[in-house]
Design a protein with these regions (language model features):
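Hydrophobic alpha-helical transmembrane segments in multi-pass integral membrane proteins
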Residues: 44, 85, 89-90, 139-145, ...
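Residues within membrane-spanning alpha-helices of integral membrane proteins
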Residues: 5, 49, 103-106, 110, ...
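Membrane-interface helix termini and inter-helical loops of multi-pass transporters
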Residues: 87-97, 120-122, 183-195, 239-242
């Protein structure tokens, strides 16, 4: 087994474990290393999306009864439109200043929500949903990291961790399927991506099973703080890999 194959396998375990435990973070975790293992950045984001699709599909099937489509469509459709535009505009990512701003913003926002989450309740209005979908679309299209804006919306608007997980994963599943189609149209779905997906598939299965066990034992009252903490960690990861 080559070092690249082993790296993709191990990264897939870690990314799917995080996704299954916190509801997001697959792309943020795996994209810290995947661009260095793939021929191009576009192929790296495509592989990340394919593996994330597999993780989300397994979660959605298990929690499908918790999905409320009426609250999902506005943010999802906005995300699809914005991320499609962003992917078509993507040639290469060189804007280090934007990534620094993104990292700092995630850290500050997560700390704010940790401190004041009991006093904050995001309304499920169209304006809030469109705003979250727009930010998520920009981050997903350019960086393959569409999670944080949508997660902040769902964790504040859904009544239980099961509802949150079901809504977030349905959102990510449909969004990633769409983005993968657009990336394939732009030539990023190559034979290298296909083979590397098979290498990472076993890791996804292992990570998802481990994450499901941990998720089951996390009390509702502290779950959102775990999510906020990982958003903060995500900000530091983005800053360190800038």
């Amino acid at each position: 087994m080559s070092s690249i194959v082993l790296s993709i396998f191990l990264l897939s375990i870690g990314a799917s474990f995080i996704q299954r435990t916190t509801g997001f973070g697959f792309g943020i975790f795996i994209m810290t290393m995947l661009p260095f293992l793939m021929p191009t950045y576009g192929e790296a984001t495509t592989l990340s999306g394919l593996l994330a699709i597999t993780t989300s599909a397994a979660i959605v099937w298990r929690l499908r009864n918790y999905v409320t489509w009426q609250r999902l469509w506005p943010i999802l459709l906005t995300f699809i439109i914005v991320s499609t535009i962003a992917i078509f505009a993507l040639t290469r990512i060189e804007d280090h200043i934007l990534r620094r701003i993104l990292g700092v913003a995630l850290i500050l926002i997560s700390i704010y929500f940790m401190l004041f989450s009991q006093k904050i309740k995001l309304p499920t209005t169209k304006r809030v949903q469109v705003g979250a979908g727009t930010l998520s679309g920009l981050m997903g299209g350019f960086f393959g990291m569409q999670g944080p804006p949508a997660v902040l919306y769902f964790i504040q608007s859904e009544p239980t961790k099961e509802h949150y997980m079901a809504m977030a994963q349905t959102y990510f599943l449909i969004g990633n399927v769409m983005m993968t189609g657009v990336r394939a149209y732009n030539g990023f779905f190559t034979t290298t991506v296909a083979f590397d997906y098979l290498y990472g598939l076993g890791g996804v299965i292992i990570g998802t099973m481990l994450g499901a066990y941990v998720f089951k034992h996390i009390p509702n009252r502290i779950f959102r703080y775990i999510v906020y903490a990982y958003i903060c960690i995500s900000g530091f990861i983005i800053l360190m890999t800038n």
